[in-house]
């Protein structure tokens, strides 16, 4: 979104319309450059993958992605083909003739965009020469021992070389190149230093130094204007990377960030105010299960319940129908991802549930990849015991059913004692004995390499959440990404999320936050913070986020202890909801997915391209300055109906409502009517100038 200007999601009612002149894409070439093209490392791959269809629909054959070549990724994700564009074909051929290995094909994702992949290893012999070129271009030296930075220099040099070959054969077509993150920034710096006729955009999804500082328990956001940036980068031995990032920012015609909170950070860390904020979206169609997401929730919840039965065998004294599944997922950044405050809140939640003698049990999953040796033997044994018991029950059921069937055919009601013989009783007793357990259920599914120093396990030991019988909160650390081929929890991430009740992401540093956004489009409530880009985005668009299943923890203006208490209250309030209240909340959450669709948020990228063309080629392209529409904007309103039983949604609800809610059935609730009201109300994006100044924290408050 343009700074100080309200762009809109025009297909939603109640929004001011931004009339943008369509770009002549048939006379343009668009390249997006990222280290995560066909190479998933973090969230940038999700951004590019989900946005690909929208961009490909707009640009057609003139849209290309540039990334690194890895043999495994090429075999499984890319279909090789010949370039149809003459300029691109000549550029690929020219580089291959000079000894580079350039691969071209279609990425096998929705939209099937073209990809150009460079083999870094085949060009490594040029490293010393390219280091000299880079030093002459911007005065930044790259240490020999930093292999990642050296790889980025090779990648950037190949990118700049390729773009030069393209512009030499473009036949009058103008070229736009968008570079994502500092890893791709070297190509931008070299392209500008060589004065290539290219309109450039640089997008930062997070600042290098910001991530480091936040991980050090520093009151980051309230001291942004006080940091000695060069000193901080030097102390962390990332000064050369910081210089590469900052040079990329200042060389670009247009600088964009993914959220307002990151825009503030970038202005202080990188010394340039972003021109456009480009919020991250999702391909909502990918996640939509038309009117069936409630049924999918029930189906995948049953699979999680199966895992829990095995994991807690011998201690399964809680009702699985009154058990809530919570989870946190992401990179293993203990403080940045909010795992520290989450664990402390779970300890307090456990105390509240026990004190109030609640019959609700909470099982919490930590899906955060870490270094492991192998699977935990106790965890594997639990799943084996569960499967064996299931097979035993099926065998007895068939035998019991046959005897019952024969008796009824004879016109007799069989004696129950005669149906089960001595062997059957012996089998059942052996099954019961097999479920006996002397030890507590493990808190981790794998054997950790650094068990004694692992932050999550160390905190679990401190707060005492060991999965005791008396605990109402149970904890399971799954230090590996989910996979449908896992012998423990054979589910993909999307299936797992749909089966859970609440995603909890109380991050301290989260430039955007895809995990709560993915929960939203799948109709799963989530917890986020006002320090995440997604949390700020929702606060500005939704009048009562909590009613729509998005709980926003204040981590900017409250002390860590107060934030922890607020999160505890959110979790405790969620535990007190009835089943039908949760069904209503999931319906409302799913409706917010309209806000996150790339079909709407993609227009901010469109504007960035307009802007960079007008700056790079002012004689050919002109962007008329437009003042903000005369409107105060709209918000998704507070829901007008409060009853906990949605009569209109019961057809798609897989479960019956709790008996204690029957007295509310006479209150009218029309799901479709409320949904239509909600879709007609939305607030336009806010201006950076209205962001409030934070409250100072006392020294040491962040060291929980």
From Swiss-Prot:
The record, for InterPro entries, names:
Glycogen_synth
Q: Where does alpha-D-glucose 6-phosphate bind?
A: 291-292, 294, 297, 301, 501, 582, 586
Catalysed reaction(s) here are:
[(1->4)-alpha-D-glucosyl](n) + UDP-alpha-D-glucose = [(1->4)-alpha-D-glucosyl](n+1) + UDP + H(+)
One biological process term from GO is: glycogen biosynthetic process
Q: Which residues carry this modification: Phosphoserine?
A: 8, 11, 627, 641, 645, 649, 653, 657, 684
The protein's UniProt keywords, in alphabetical order, are: Allosteric enzyme, Glycogen biosynthesis, Glycosyltransferase, Phosphoprotein, Transferase
- Tell me the residue numbers annotated for binding UDP-alpha-D-glucose: 205, 211, 331, 510, 512-513
On modification after translation, the UniProt record reads: Phosphorylation reduces the activity towards UDP-alpha-D-glucose. Primed phosphorylation at Ser-657 (site 5) by CSNK2A1 and CSNK2A2 is required for inhibitory phosphorylation at Ser-641 (site 3a), Ser-645 (site 3b), Ser-649 (site 3c) and Ser-653 (site 4) by GSK3A an GSK3B. Dephosphorylation at Ser-641 and Ser-645 by PP1 activates the enzyme. Phosphorylation at Ser-8 is not required for interaction with GYG1. Interaction with GYG1 does not regulate the phosphorylation at Ser-8 and Ser-641.
Which residues lie in Acidic residues bias regions?
Answer: 658-675
What induces its synthesis? Expression in the liver oscillates in a circadian manner with peak levels during the night.
Effect after changing residue 135 to R: Loss of interaction with GYG1. Loss of interaction with GYG1
EC number(s) recorded for this UniProt protein: 2.4.1.11
Example GO molecular function term? alpha-1,4-glucan glucosyltransferase (UDP-glucose donor) activity
Tissue expr: Specifically expressed in liver.
Annotated Gene Ontology cellular components are: cell cortex; cortical actin cytoskeleton; cytoplasm; cytoskeleton; cytosol
Q: Does the keyword Flavoprotein apply?
A: no
**Regulation of its function:** Allosteric activation by glucose-6-phosphate. Phosphorylation reduces the activity towards UDP-glucose. When in the non-phosphorylated state, glycogen synthase does not require glucose-6-phosphate as an allosteric activator; when phosphorylated it does.
Q: Name one Pfam family in it.
A: Glycogen_syn
Q: Where is the composition biased (Low complexity)?
A: 647-657
Q: Which residues bind UDP?
A: 40, 331, 515
Disordered as annotated region, ranges? 620-704
Q: What does this protein do?
A: Glycogen synthase participates in the glycogen biosynthetic process along with glycogenin and glycogen branching enzyme. Extends the primer composed of a few glucose units formed by glycogenin by adding new glucose units to it. In this context, glycogen synthase transfers the glycosyl residue from UDP-Glc to the non-reducing end of alpha-1,4-glucan.
Please give the family membership noted in the entry. Belongs to the glycosyltransferase 3 family.
What is said about its interaction partners and assembly? Part of the glycogen synthase (GS)-glycogenin complex, a heterooctamer composed of a tetramer of GS and 2 dimers of glycogenin, where each GS protomer binds to one glycogenin subunit (via glycogenin C-terminus); the GS tetramer may dissociate from glycogenin dimers to continue glycogen polymerization on its own. May also form a heterooctamer complex with GYG1 (via GYG1 C-terminus).
Indicate what this protein is called per its UniProt record.
Answer: Glycogen [starch] synthase, liver
Organism of origin:
Mus musculus
């Amino acid at each position: 979104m343009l700074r100080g200007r309200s762009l809109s999601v025009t297909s939603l009612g109640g929004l001011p319309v931004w009339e943008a002149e369509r770009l002549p894409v048939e006379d343009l070439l668009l390249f997006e450059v990222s280290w995560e093209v066909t190479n998933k490392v973090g969230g940038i791959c999700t951004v590019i993958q989900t946005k690909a269809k929208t961009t490909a629909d707009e640009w057609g054959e003139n849209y290309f992605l540039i990334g690194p070549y890895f043999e495994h990724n090429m075999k499984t994700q890319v279909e090789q083909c010949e370039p149809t564009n003459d300029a691109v074909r000549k550029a690929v051929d020219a580089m291959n003739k000079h000894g580079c290995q350039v691969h071209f094909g279609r990425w096998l994702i929705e939209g099937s965009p073209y990809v150009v992949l460079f083999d870094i290893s085949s060009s490594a012999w040029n490293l010393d020469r390219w280091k000299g070129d880079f030093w002459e271009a911007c005065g930044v030296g790259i240490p020999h021992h930093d292999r990642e930075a050296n790889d980025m220099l090779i990648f950037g040099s190949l990118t700049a070389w390729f773009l030069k070959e393209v512009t030499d054969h473009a036949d009058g077509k103008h070229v736009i190149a968008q570079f994502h993150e500092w890893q791709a920034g070297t190509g931008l710096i070299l392209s500008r230093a060589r004065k290539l006729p290219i309109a450039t955009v640089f997008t930062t999804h997070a600042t290098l130094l910001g991530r480091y500082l936040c991980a050090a328990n520093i009151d980051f956001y309230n001291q942004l204007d006080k940091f000695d940036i060069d000193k901080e980068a030097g102390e962390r031995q990332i000064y050369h990377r910081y210089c590469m990032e900052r040079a990329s920012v200042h060389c670009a015609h247009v600088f964009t960030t993914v959220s307002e909170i990151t825009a503030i950070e970038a202005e202080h860390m990188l010394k340039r105010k972003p021109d456009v904020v480009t919020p991250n979206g999702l391909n909502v169609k990918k996640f939509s299960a038309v009117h069936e997401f409630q049924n999918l929730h029930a189906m995948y919840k049953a699979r999680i319940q199966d895992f829990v039965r095995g994991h807690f065998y011998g201690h399964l004294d809680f009702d699985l129908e009154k058990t809530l599944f919570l989870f946190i997922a992401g990179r293993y950044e203990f403080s940045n991802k909010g795992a520290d405050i989450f664990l402390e809140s779970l300890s307090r939640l456990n105390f509240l549930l026990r004190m109030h003698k609640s019959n609700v049990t909470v099982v919490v999953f930590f899906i955060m990849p870490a270094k492991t040796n192998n699977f935990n033997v106790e965890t594997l044994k639990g799943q084996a015991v569960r499967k064996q018991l299931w097979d035993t029950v099926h065998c007895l059921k068939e035998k019991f059913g046959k005897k019952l069937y024969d008796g009824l055919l004879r016109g007799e009601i069989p004696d129950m004692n005669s149906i089960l013989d001595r062997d059957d009783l012996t089998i059942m007793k052996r099954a019961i004995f097999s479920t006996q357990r002397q030890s507590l259920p493990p808190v981790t599914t794998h054997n950790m390499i650094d068990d004694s120093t692992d932050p999550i396990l160390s905190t679990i030991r401190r707060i005492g959440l060991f999965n005791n019988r008396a605990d109402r909160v149970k904890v399971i650390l799954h230090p590996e990404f989910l996979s449908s081929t896992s012998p423990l929890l054979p589910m993909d991430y999307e299936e797992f999320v749909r089966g859970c009740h609440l995603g909890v992401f109380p991050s301290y540093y989260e430039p955007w936050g895809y995990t709560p956004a993915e929960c939203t489009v799948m109709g799963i409530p989530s917890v986020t913070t006002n320090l995440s880009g997604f949390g700020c985005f929702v606060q500005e668009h939704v009048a009562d986020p909590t009613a729509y299943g998005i709980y926003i923890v204040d981590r900017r203006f409250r002390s860590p202890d107060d934030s922890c208490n607020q999160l505890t209250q959110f979790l405790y309030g969620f535990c007190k909801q009835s089943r039908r209240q949760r069904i209503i909340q999931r319906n409302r959450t799913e409706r917010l997915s309209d806000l996150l669709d790339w079909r709407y948020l993609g227009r901010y990228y469109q504007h960035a391209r307009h802007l960079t063309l007008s700056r790079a080629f002012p004689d050919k392209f002109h962007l008329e300055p437009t003042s903000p529409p005369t409107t105060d904007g709209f918000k998704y309103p507070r829901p007008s109906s409060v009853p906990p039983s949605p009569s209109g949604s019961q057809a798609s609800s897989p479960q019956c409502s709790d008996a204690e809610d029957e007295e509310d059935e006479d209150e009218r609730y029309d799901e479709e009517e409320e949904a239509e009201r909600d879709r007609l109300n939305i607030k336009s994006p806010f201006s950076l100038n209205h962001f409030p100044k934070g409250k100072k924290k006392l020294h040491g408050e962040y060291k929980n």
